[in-house]
Amino acid sequence: MNNSLSPKAIRELREETCNPLGAPQVTTDLSENIIMTSLDDLHNWARLSSLWPLLYGTACCFIEFAALIGSRFDFDRFGLVPRSSPRQADLLIVAGTVTMKMAPALVRLYEQMPEPKYVIAMGACTITGGMFSADSTTAVRGVDKLIPVDLYLPGCPPRPEAIFDAVIKLRKKVGNESILERNKAEQTHRYLTVKHDMKLVFSENTGEYLNKKSEKAIKSSDLEMIEENIKVKIEENLIDEETK
């Protein structure tokens, strides 16, 4: 009987005997309830809307960040929940000048944060040392010499709107990265800013101005002569007034 059947009929007969229920068909309702994604995308999607920052403020830039807590800006809508413990945070926001004595504490806080973790350098003093980078021997010339920085936010100080823009850009970075690539890009060496290129500036006060006749120190004898001349002029003025 099989010899008289066509190949198509034989395949259909084989499917009926092997699978009597038939091939399952994916309905429209079932397709709307299935999400196809990768582990990296699912992991990044869960993290980008729940960044928990650790606020490390040492100077005036942190005052601008404190304005975000109020109802006018309301940074809670971005899922930012400030934490007081580095073990519960995944975002470190450094705002203000970092000194040599505070550098070990900052590095310790960063190392206590669990992976994956991110850093935002906020303000000119945090990024380059700011106005203290010219002649200060205690200011760190850039926090990226201590810990790896993911996003730089320049300004003195940055506006709250700029902080929001930095958070949005960081969320885009979080949503496009891979876990394995993130581990490969971790910093393995750290170089502290202990040597500064300082230059000697000579004093402009050389004392040459004292040699000028117009700026010489007045002697006591000269003061007596000036007082006598003033008295004489006063007496002459009094005599002129009496004669009038």
Curated annotation (Swiss-Prot):
In the bilayer, the protein is annotated as:
Peripheral membrane protein
GO biological process terms, semicolon-separated:
aerobic respiration; electron transport coupled proton transport; photosynthesis, light reaction
Q: Write out the residues that bind [4Fe-4S] cluster.
A: C60, C61, C125, C156
Annotated Gene Ontology cellular components are:
plasma membrane-derived thylakoid membrane; respiratory chain complex I
Q: Which cofactor does it need?
A: [4Fe-4S] cluster
Instruction: Give the Gene Ontology MF terms in alphabetical order.
Output: 4 iron, 4 sulfur cluster binding; iron ion binding; NADH dehydrogenase (ubiquinone) activity; quinone binding
Cofactor detail note: Binds 1 [4Fe-4S] cluster.
Q: What class of enzyme is it?
A: translocase
- Give the catalysed reaction(s), semicolon-separated: a plastoquinone + NADH + (n+1) H(+)(in) = a plastoquinol + NAD(+) + n H(+)(out); a plastoquinone + NADPH + (n+1) H(+)(in) = a plastoquinol + NADP(+) + n H(+)(out)
Supply the PANTHER family for this chain. NADH DEHYDROGENASE, NADH DEHYDROGENASE [UBIQUINONE] IRON-SULFUR PROTEIN 7, MITOCHONDRIAL
Protein role: NDH-1 shuttles electrons from an unknown electron donor, via FMN and iron-sulfur (Fe-S) centers, to quinones in the respiratory and/or the photosynthetic chain. The immediate electron acceptor for the enzyme in this species is believed to be plastoquinone. Couples the redox reaction to proton translocation, and thus conserves the redox energy in a proton gradient. Cyanobacterial NDH-1 also plays a role in inorganic carbon-concentration.
Q: What is this protein called?
A: NAD(P)H-quinone oxidoreductase subunit K
